[in-house]
Amino acid sequence: MNFKTVISLFLVLFVSFVYCENGAELLFHKKIVEGPVVGKELPIQFIIYNVGSEPAYDISFIDNDFSNAEFEFVSGSSEGKWETLAPNSQVQTNLTVIPKKSGIYSLTSTVLNYRKTQTSSEFTVSSAASYSGMYVESQADYEKRTSLLIKEWITFFVLCAGAIALPYSISTYYKKNYENGIKK
């Protein structure tokens, strides 16, 4: 490498370290744990990670995706509020609902508000990494998709047994006649 390239790389690294913003940086994730099925509990996790070098303050979010009449509330909370979140740590809250009818539901990004420093009056807004839509499967479709398929397996084994038994019986017949001769 020539001298100019080394100096320019050093300057770029130096400038990036000098202008790198310190403080709290939060990542927010809304996670649907299992596949949604009508009449079955649907657990949802809200996870907040602080990947910054400083604590975050006055953290709050509210999620309204599951507050309508199509979902029955079971446990947990669709909102969260914390005073501080230490660097390199995480917090999580859970929500459990039961879908009442099948169909496609649009999901919005849950908005997270927090302050990067304790003295800051300005709130930083972040959105949850989430899904754009969610398909709630009917109970009949779920049972059809996950059943043991007993009839299909029995049919499979009968056809396999026939495919194996016929050549075996012919082979046994010819072997017996070859050894003992054909009876008259």
From Swiss-Prot:
Record keywords: Endoplasmic reticulum, Glycoprotein, Membrane, Signal, Transmembrane, Transmembrane helix
KW Thylakoid (keyword) present: no
Subcellular location, record wording: Endoplasmic reticulum membrane
Membrane-related topology note: Single-pass type I membrane protein
Broad class of the protein's primary localization: endoplasmic reticulum
Residues annotated as transmembrane: 148-168
Organism superkingdom: Eukaryota
Membrane topology (Lumenal): 21-147
Cellular component terms per the entry's GO annotation: endoplasmic reticulum membrane; phagocytic vesicle
Record note on quaternary structure: Heterotrimer of TRAP-alpha, TRAP-beta and TRAP-gamma.
Family (UniProt): Belongs to the TRAP-beta family.
Protein name: Translocon-associated protein subunit beta
